[in-house]
A protein has these predicted regions:
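Thr-Gly-centered strand-to-loop micro-motif
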Residues: 23-25
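A conserved beta-turn-beta hairpin within the catalytic core of GNAT-like acetyltransferases
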Residues: 19-21
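Unchanged
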Residues: 28-52, 60-120, 129-134
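Short loop/turn segments immediately following the C-termini of beta-strands
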Residues: 16
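Conserved N-terminal beta-strand and adjoining loop/helix that marks the start
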Residues: 1-11
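Aromatic-lined ligand-binding clefts that engage carbohydrates, nucleic acids, or primary amines
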Residues: 125
Length: 134
């Protein structure tokens, strides 16, 4: 799961230990729903409490990300709303910041691409969004 969190028309990205940036998120644990997992991952990586509001997209990683893996992976992008918290350094991320679409930092392309982030911006601005899926 990957969380799309907006503030002032900017999207939240977290900086990983390797210096690359991504939407907060991670593997979905077998005992958690997609909704519960995205809430947990945002708390772990960004220190924020969120409400999951809308599914933006359900995408096949092999079709949409350059980094390939031996496993078939489905990525679920969720539009979320912040309800509390603040960033705390942790084991997975060293920082967080909000970015405009035309000013994205160097991304972790196996986790999210500029096109996927643009899709999140599009969903954020749409009154009636239809989930994109492969």
């Amino acid at each position: 799961t990957r969380a799309a969190i907006f503030q002032d028309n900017k999207i939240l990205l977290v900086q990983e230990n390797d210096g690359l940036w991504s939407l907060p998120g991670g593997w979905c644990d077998v005992d958690q729903s997609v909704k519960d997992n995205v809430i947990k991952e945002v708390k772990e990586e960004a220190g924020l409490e969120v409400e999951a509001k809308r599914v933006v997209a359900i995408l096949d990683k092999h079709k949409n990300n350059p980094a390939k893996s031996a496993h078939r992976v489905t990525k679920v992008f969720i539009l979320c709303k912040v309800i509390g918290g603040e960033f705390q350094p942790n084991l997975e991320t060293i920082g967080s910041a909000y970015f405009e679409l035309n000013d994205l930092p160097q991304l972790s392309l196996g986790k999210n691409t500029p096109e996927q982030i643009a899709l999140c911006f599009e969903a954020c601005h749409a009154k009636h969004w239809e989930t994109r899926f492969d």
